[in-house]
Amino acid sequence: MEKIRFLECLSKQYPTIDSAATEIINLQSILNLPKGTEHFLSDIHGEYKAFAHVLRNGSGAVMKKIDDVFGDTLFEDQKEDLASLIYYPSEKLQYVKNQGRADSSWYRTTLYRLVSVCQIVSSKYTRSKVRKAMPENFRYVIEELITEKKEVLNKKAYYDEIINTIIEIGCADEFIVEMSNLIQRLVIDHLHIIGDIYDRGYGSHFVMDSLMNYHSLDIQWGNHDVLWMGAFAGQHACIANIVRTSLLYDNLSVLENGYGISMMPLVLFAMETYADDPCAQFTIRSRHGSEMNTQTVLAMKMHKAITIIQFKLEGQLIAKHPEYNMDNRRLLDKIDADKGTVTIDGKEYPMLDRYFPTIDFNNPYELTSEEQSVIAKLCNSFVNCSKLKSHINLLLQKGSLYKVCNNNLLFHGCIPMNEDGSFRNINLFGEDLCGKELYDELERWARKAFFSVNEEEKRVGRDILWFLWNGADSPLYGRDKMTTFERYFIADESTHKEIKDVYYRLFNDEEVVDKIFKMFGIKGDNAHIINGHVPIHHTEGESPVKCNGKVIIIDGGFSQPYHKVTGIAGYTLIYNSYGLMLTAHEPFKSVDYTIRSGRDMQTNQVATEVSQKRILVGDTDNGKKIRENIKDLKDLIKAYRNGTLRQNQKN
């Protein structure tokens, strides 16, 4: 009966045998097309300019297509010139005009070259899919130019006439821009962001803006992303963490200019409370140098003020949730105010800062009324920010803690493990959970923070978002503790150490990795774990490819401060119909440099995994869905033919 009801619904879309049969033929043809190109990025950390460029060049995929089309028929500088036009069409056009090169001959040559590139990048898709990607204003013209027309005898004259008309009527600039954007879109079929869009970079909000308009993507949440999700949900400790790190990295512009969140409540409080305090331990890590000025002095006071608020809020939260197993992060009550020391793990350390006017050491985690007012006002700004709302909605709609896609397991951090290679049981919700079950339950509660109608469930969900940010058992964080307190207040650097989860030592063990695959229902020789979070030390010879190619770590350091540590500016992964290509990127110089020189950011192919045969749509997850659709349509035709359902022929 259920099957009949389903077929009745399907019959509204395909009311006749002919319409169902036509769709089966269309779907069957799609199965035999080459699979679309998947693009994997991780740990963007707000570095918008580098991120935007990698999106535009498809991690070298655009240049690869130009090479495929033109081979040795163009010089390298000509190919680079064409590539930079495709990446930045409006800016490159203006540059060419300023040079006096934009005559009809240049336009004609450029348009032909763009058409040639567009023909090859569109060849792996159905006409319908390409048509939908085309700009509406030039859809017909582009389709004419990139489609083979066997009925046209003098093809050169036919295409010449179209190109000449585009130039003569003054539409060449707009056409070049639209063609370039179409090429960018068709080069990458689907984008995977494996966590940490947010962090210290100056452009997290711009990254989110660009993802809002991206044609096809999924996101695996990183610990920095869930921190922002928690802040929007109204979790006070998450808000304090974001404000603190924004001050630490001289990055208030994202909050104030990007999201319109006013820091004035914190400014007034810090100026009054820490007026005579130099706040020397709360320096600002600016990219523009460490010059001490009035603005920096104020930022340091704000930095200390919000840090103390954060430690109080986190202490309250940890006490409320003993199941988080984070009591070693409650350190305010371990301070001996008279001696100016703090005791951690039984050892006493001198404090680098001893001035705490807002801490009552008889009740150290209680906020003063002024601190309560500051965090309440900040919270009001976060939860009522419409732009942040749209960005967090995107994270909720397109995001998850993990994803299985085309035999690849994608997650940001780790699978919590024991020393013996078994999955670590974690009890957060009254039962022991590990591996996939832990991920699934954590995601359910994270979503409850936004969608539950039960206020207690929403509160628990909000708190789980904070736990995911820095919890010792958080699969997103993957370290035994976050030593924020120690880094501010203790000189002994041995206390700053954060021990990585055992997973990061065991992901070279094939038996362990195969066990992870089995838990997530992944089979076959071409299975991979793809994750980020832990920067790969490229210059020290560390490889991002682990476990004989089964594990690929693609955090190579998009974030500028990590460039010295990793030696590069990030890894990106391409998975096309020929296999996997892992690329290491040199730091992105600037848009202006790319336009003027034509030179792209330097990329080095680190590893490849070539498929024994070309991978078709039929070999992918989408292919499985298409086969299911074909089966349903065949059942519908059968129901029409045996009289179970009646065709709805239109007169």
Language-model region placement:
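Feature recognizes metal-dependent phosphohydrolase scaffolds
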Residues: M1-N651
